[in-house]
A protein has these predicted regions:
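Alpha/beta enzyme core
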Residues: 3, 33, 38-40, 45-205
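N-terminal basic, low-complexity leaders that serve as flexible interaction/assembly modules and, when applicable
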Residues: 1-44
Length: 207
């Protein structure tokens, strides 16, 4: 194991050997293996933005297996997707790419300035599919943010109790945040800090 990966694992000394082992699997897979850097292919666009909008420009992408193979061929560290997408190919591609089960999702079928994602999967699902981690999206700035923070924390506790790693995607969104503010450095940094606090760990921001 590389010195850099050992250093990163040392940041998670409060976690179990199982969780640290799964984190090591993420860091030691793909073209960036051992460098301490991560490239994860996330494919939640079909749920979040609609299949036609997301996949029509590249019809092959309608096939869930396409994304597994894309992550593998691209040398990604992991592939992250909602429950249905992972269920479609987890057996066929078992052991070829670390999987991250996206636990909550949001749609755009109605205008919602203060987003609240629905919980669409469970830790049991992640274990059944052989995932190394679960992922959860939070929207700091939304009027529903407090609900998401609680859900996120409960999900992380349960996942880590079973030796899984956890990923938090933290996006500043809400009726009181301007479009420019969504990408403002101070606002994004604040959202990242909230995500870190949710995980109880150091921010992993080596890019």
């Amino acid at each position: 194991m590389s010195k850099r990966v050992k250093e990163i694992l040392s940041w998670y000394s409060s976690d179990s050997p199982g969780t640290r082992t799964n984190l090591a699997r993420l860091l030691n897979h793909g073209r960036l293996a051992g460098t301490g850097r991560l490239v994860i292919l996330p494919v939640d666009q079909g749920f979040e933005h609609g299949a036609a909008r997301s996949f029509a420009p590249n019809p092959d992408a309608y096939d869930p297996d396409y994304h597994f193979q894309l992550a593998i061929d691209s040398g990604c560290n992991a592939y992250a997707a909602p429950l249905g997408f992972l269920e479609a190919g987890a057996a066929e591609f078992a052991g070829e790419i670390p999987l991250i089960l996206k636990m909550n999702n949001h749609d755009v079928l109605h205008d919602e300035k203060d987003p609240l994602s629905a919980v669409t999967a469970s830790v049991k699902d992640a274990l059944r599919l052989g995932a190394v981690a679960v992922g959860f999206t939070i929207y700091p700035g939304s009027t529903a943010a407090q609900v998401m923070y609680q859900q996120c924390r409960e999900m992380i506790l349960e996942a880590k109790s079973h030796g899984l790693a956890a990923v938090v995607w933290s996006y500043p969104r809400g009726s009181d945040i301007s479009k420019a503010g969504e990408t403002g450095l101070d606002v994004v940094a604040y959202a990242a800090q909230i995500g870190r606090a949710s995980c109880r760990e150091r921010v992993y921001d080596d890019v």
